[in-house]
From Swiss-Prot:
PROSITE patterns according to UniProt: FAD_PCMH
Top-level division of the source organism's lineage: Bacteria
Catalyzed chemical reaction(s): UDP-N-acetyl-alpha-D-muramate + NADP(+) = UDP-N-acetyl-3-O-(1-carboxyvinyl)-alpha-D-glucosamine + NADPH + H(+)
Function, in words: Cell wall formation.
Location of the active site: 176, 226 (proton donor), 296
Compartments in which it is found: Cytoplasm
Molecular function, one GO term: UDP-N-acetylmuramate dehydrogenase activity
Keywords: Cell cycle, Cell division, Cell shape, Cell wall biogenesis/degradation, Cytoplasm, FAD, Flavoprotein, NADP, Oxidoreductase, Peptidoglycan synthesis
EC number per UniProt: 1.3.1.98
Protein name per its UniProtKB record: UDP-N-acetylenolpyruvoylglucosamine reductase 2
Amino acid sequence: MNMQEVYKYLSTVLPEGHVKQDEMLKNHTHIKVGGKADVFVAPTNYDEIQEVIKYANEYNIPVTFLGNGSNVIIKDGGIRGITVSLIHITGVTVTGTTIVAQCGAAIIDVSRIALDHNLTGLEFACGIPGSVGGALYMNAGAYGGEISFVLTEAVVMTGDGELRTLTKEAFEFGYRKSVFANNHYIILEARFELEEGVHEEIKAKMDDLTFKRESKQPLEYPSCGSVFKRPPNNFAGKLIQDSGLQGKRIGGVEVSLKHAGFMVNVDNGTAQDYIDLIHFVQKTVEEKFGVKLEREVRIIGEDKE
């Protein structure tokens, strides 16, 4: 279907300024790479998401969903069809020890809201840069905590635009994975069950984790965080470091000198630079140690022609 027609129609469904054509997706990822989206939309509520899905299904237009782009590489050829950004779906409510957070809310902000209400259980998330939806998608975690420990249920939207509530068991959580990598559900909101705690103790733990993160991670450069999952009985960063790969650069992307588990965009790198460096690191580590590193970061989109 003609993308100009898609743009025109969706402009009548969403608020002014929330539908764009040929939007550069590098502006919507932490690593600052990615080509153009044919049509880029940023809905503000569930009804608008349903309208987009209904329209896309009617005309067989592919739809790709983005959170805040913290753990994704979008290829240099961009994304065909409709790209839906969920960054405006950000509501958070607190009732007793329960927090309900919408998909586009930053998980860091949710952890701070928990602190404000003297609730413990989300301290580990105080340095995770992703959205709530992304955190559920990959069962995000850090410093011994992970989303699956505190999630009780979630509201999702099916590929037909139907709303469903899923219990935690349906997520099939594992280490940095969930069922959402293999189905077409869109995570809309999550319910977290926390415990009452002491404000000063919660804050002290968050301050400690923030200090560790800032002292060990290359936050001064664009990155996607940890590139690889932790292999059994080992650490990806240590294997990469012991392979002598810190500082290895392809194009504008290099293995961080500060933390070997990170790859940083130091000089206008491209998605292809990033992908090539990932493959080089995987090949080198496997040759030296016999360990095949598994990607944690998602790669989506089309290659540049």
